Structure formats: structure tokens, C-alpha cells
Amino acid sequence: MGAWLFILAVVVNCINLFGQVHFTILYADLEADYINPIELCSKVNKLITPEAALHGALSLLFLLNGYWFVFLLNLPVLAYNLNKIYNKVQLLDATEIFRTLGKHKRESFLKLGFHLLMFFFYLYRMIMALIAESGDDF
């Protein structure tokens, strides 16, 4: 079961990683005036809630399967996402985006770094779980 969970974690984390890259590119495009604020907010707002939901579901799976350490690693980002959703500030506003662009870029870079580190952690744990499961067959 552990190997399948970490395979799923690698896949879900890749989706979130590419989402953060997409957000970062969109913020850079807005800064360079290649995209207008309404278009940026429309694109980003469609993806913010699914990104948080995927991360939350993955964290919940780790908690339910007894991987406490992995759950605790995910807890700060999970708490941050839940706090934003609870306070209803997860969506971007086109009228305020230029004023808050620096904050959103910093958040995107931090999440990008988090998901990149977690990708290698999940990959390592997946390989170790696959080796452990293949060792049980002999």
C-alpha cells in the first residue's frame, strides 16, 4: 500500500509543481504586460482551489495511512491553504492585482520550492517502498 501511496504522491505533487510554474509564468507575464489583469485572474482563480484540494487530499491520505512525518511536512502549506480558503482570500482580484503582485509571486515561489523538495522526497520514499515490497516477495 505504501508504494502506491507514494506513486500517487509523486503524480499529484507533479501536478501541483507544474501548477506553481504556470502561476509564476503568469505573474511574470503580467509584470511584463503580456497579459491583462482580468485574464490573469480568470486563469489563476480557476486553478487555486483545485491545487489546494489536491494537496489537502494527499495530506489526508498520508494522515489516514499513518505516515505522520510526511503529514507533518505537509501541514504548514495545508494550514496556509486552509486559512486562505477559510478567510475567503484565496481568489485574486483584478482591481488589486498590481498592488499585491509581489506577495503572490513570493507565495508562488515558496510553494514552487516546497513542491520541488517534496517531489524528491516522495520519489525517494516511493523507491524505498518499492524496494521493500519487492524484498517481501523472496
Curated annotation (Swiss-Prot):
Q: Where in the cell is it found?
A: Endoplasmic reticulum membrane; Golgi apparatus membrane
**UniProt key word Magnesium:** no
**Membrane topology, Cytoplasmic segments:** 2-6, 74-111
Keyword annotations: Endoplasmic reticulum, Golgi apparatus, Membrane, Transmembrane, Transmembrane helix
Please name the GO terms of the biological process aspect recorded for this protein, alphabetically: ascospore formation; axial cellular bud site selection; endoplasmic reticulum to Golgi vesicle-mediated transport; negative regulation of receptor localization to synapse; regulation of AMPA receptor activity
Please verify whether the record's keywords include Transmembrane: yes
Transmembrane intervals: 7-27, 53-73, 112-132
Q: Name one GO molecular function term.
A: cargo receptor activity
Q: What is this protein called?
A: ER-derived vesicles protein ERV14
Q: Name one GO cellular component term.
A: endoplasmic reticulum
Family annotation (PROSITE patterns): CORNICHON
| PANTHER family linked to this entry | CORNICHON-RELATED (PTHR12290)
Family that this chain belongs to:
Belongs to the cornichon family.
Role description: Could regulate export of the bud site and axial growth sites selection protein AXL2 and possibly other secretory proteins from the endoplasmic reticulum in COPII-coated vesicles. Seems to be required for axial budding pattern in haploid cells.
Query: What's the miscellaneous note?
Result: Present with 7110 molecules/cell in log phase SD medium.
Kindly give the membrane topology term recorded for this protein. Answer: Multi-pass membrane protein
Q: Which residues lie on this side of the membrane: Extracellular?
A: 28-52, 133-138
Q: What is the lineage of its organism?
A: Eukaryota, Fungi, Dikarya, Ascomycota, Saccharomycotina
Disrupted-gene phenotype = Defects in cell polarity. Strains homozygous for ERV14 deletion do not sporulate.
Tell me where it mainly resides. Answer: endoplasmic reticulum
